[in-house]
Amino acid sequence: MEEEKHGWQAIAAKKKQIQRALIRQYATCETQTTQGENPNRPAGVAAFGELTEKLSRGELSCEDVVKEQICSLTEILFDNAISRAKQLDKYFQEHRRPVGPLHGIPVTLKDQFDVAGFDSTIGYVGRAFNPATRDSALVEMLRSLGAIIMAKTNLPQSIMWCETENPLWGLTVNPLHSGYTPGGSTGGESALLASGASILGWGTDIGGSVRIPAHMMGLYGFKPSSARLPYRGVPVSTEGQEHVPSSIGPLARSLDGIHTAFKSLIELKPWDFDARCAAIPWREDIYQETSKRPLVIGVLFDDGVVRPHPPITRVLHFAVDALRAAGHHIVDWNAQLHAECVQLMDRFYKVDGGEDIREAVKAGGEPFIEHVQKLVDCGDPISVFQYWQLNRRKWELQQQYLEKWNAMRCAKNNRPVDVVIMPPMSHTSVPHRSCRWVGYTKVWNVLDYPALVIPAGNVCAQDIGASWSFESRNSLDEWNKKLWDNCKEVMASLQLPVGVQIIGRRYADEAVLAAGKVIDDVLRASA
């Protein structure tokens, strides 16, 4: 007989019981197995563009697409999704046109975006059974574009980590190997997308939480400048802080999904939905101009703190060689100011002495996961005056980095640098609870620069024997070296994905997406 659970464990057990009961309703989805019965059934339609085309022509029904996606999902808005799909199919039958550019596209959300009638737990037991009364601005906008909200996905306790684990829902695993992480904090999304169980996912990024999972799972992930997309109705730990704002961003298995989703949302004028959004329209002229000429690309191989593993460096060298061969100009970038930006970010994380997260965990009574325990045990809160000095230093660093970027020019044509490319992390996916250093992504949150991750390669057998002998710079560098030595054979056997990160100036989101398309096309053609 199962032992009766009490306190936070009873709450978690009840949530999972409800979840599993709802899943069982769809455990055996209706599929058309008769050969030739429907050649356009959605099975195998992985590309975002192919799916939108078939839906817009009426070759697929929204209901069929949703039912097929449900077969692989674990979070539960299924009844609502089927109902919405039927509404969209009826609209198409009556009007012979789609509702919008995301008509019928199944969408999943990190368990942070409010959906009326459903919890937004953000990994806390104390937020369970407290459903939102209103959709978040993003959900309102996605629905108006024709998207179908399918599910909400797992994230770490407090959100503030690059792996995905909490006492309420448990540990999210990598579909390639259950002993490895899919990244975080948007790890539920990356695991679903990599499994083929979602078409378009949405997460948030305050230190790499969209880009790291994309890198680890071979996906596309975009962190826009923070004020481009609406944060209204998206609860978060340390809510109210403005020193390093979090960004909302998409993940997908294709870049056209990222581009279409972001552009379509901007064209809905997010500033009419959220007072914090900048009134910057979609600038097609910037996108087209960037797309049609040779790019000046800065490249940074090493942030000076933690050396990347051999496959990370090899893949970036491959990208640089391919881009140079395609006629683009490469400029050596440096890591000046990066370490100080990361150190400042770490201080910002701790300004309240861990009070916000401590109180949220206390409300549910669950234990802290190890990383969160360390975060809340970070010391005492600082004074308002001390906090102001940190913000002053942030502005100084942002100005210094702007001047650094302005000073970097291509020696051949004196053009400024369009984008910088660099690793998203020092390693690929790793065994659970092994991540330590996120400086390769975090720096761009301090600066609030847009950053895109694209898949660029995989760990392979030749990486195992690569020369990688050096004296460690610090304890983090030593940890990273041991991680490679201990895991390289498994990483190679799994052919773990490796991404490349593409960064642009603040608010140059259209230029980053355009450069991303150019770079992605070059890499695909050179593979």
Where on the chain are the PLM-derived regions?
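An N-terminal boundary/leader segment
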Residues: M1-K90, A325-G327, D477-W479, M491-A492, ...
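Structural helix-boundary/capping segments
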Residues: E140, S144, A194-L300, H317-A326, ...
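Classical protein tyrosine phosphatase
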Residues: E59, E63-E68, M141, H317-A322, ...
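N-terminal, positively charged, Ser/Thr/Ala/Gly-biased leader segments
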Residues: E59, E63, I70-R127
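Short glycine/threonine-rich loop-to-helix capping motif typified by GTGT followed
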Residues: I312, C341-D352, V430-R436
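Short glycine/serine-rich loop/turn segments
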Residues: P101-I248, L300-D302, V351, V420-C435, ...
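Acidic-enriched catalytic cores of C-N bond-cleaving enzymes acting on peptides and small amides
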Residues: M1-T34, N38, R253-P281, Q288-T290, ...
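Serine-dependent amide/ester hydrolase catalytic core
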Residues: G49-S56, F301, P308, L337, ...
